[in-house]
């Protein structure tokens, strides 16, 4: 899938899809967070994997 803007519930749904039962986390506000990365800009499914719990 191409990179796309993911905001709000669309972003959460994409994280559940990519991360599955591992779950996911948000980075601290002083770093570039997932909203800045995926909503204000675009991100790919590969980018989303970086926010999954290990």
UniProtKB/Swiss-Prot annotation:
PROSITE patterns documented for this protein = INSULIN
Supply the alphabetized keyword list: Carbohydrate metabolism, Disulfide bond, Glucose metabolism, Hormone, Secreted
Keyword presence, Disulfide bond: yes
Protein location:
Secreted
This chain's protein is named: Insulin
Q: What's a Gene Ontology MF term here?
A: hormone activity
Family, per the entry? Belongs to the insulin family.
Taxonomic placement: Eukaryota, Metazoa, Chordata, Craniata, Vertebrata
Disulfide pairs here are 7-39, 19-52, 38-43
Q: Which Pfam families match?
A: Insulin
GO BP, sorted A to Z: glucose metabolic process
- What PANTHER family does this protein map onto? INSULIN (PTHR11454:SF9), INSULIN/INSULIN GROWTH FACTOR (PTHR11454)
How does this chain assemble? Answer: Heterodimer of a B chain and an A chain linked by two disulfide bonds.
What biological function has been recorded for the protein in this entry?
A: Insulin decreases blood glucose concentration. It increases cell permeability to monosaccharides, amino acids and fatty acids. It accelerates glycolysis, the pentose phosphate cycle, and glycogen synthesis in liver.
Q: Which residues form a coiled coil?
A: none
**Any one of the GO CC terms:** extracellular space
Gene3D superfamilies with a match to the protein in the record: Insulin-like
């Amino acid at each position: 899938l191409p990179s796309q803007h993911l905001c709000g519930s669309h972003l959460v749904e994409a994280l559940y899809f990519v991360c599955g039962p591992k779950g996911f986390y948000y980075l601290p506000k002083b770093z570039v967070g997932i909203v800045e990365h995926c909503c204000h800009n675009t991100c790919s499914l590969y980018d989303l994997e970086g926010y999954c719990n290990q």
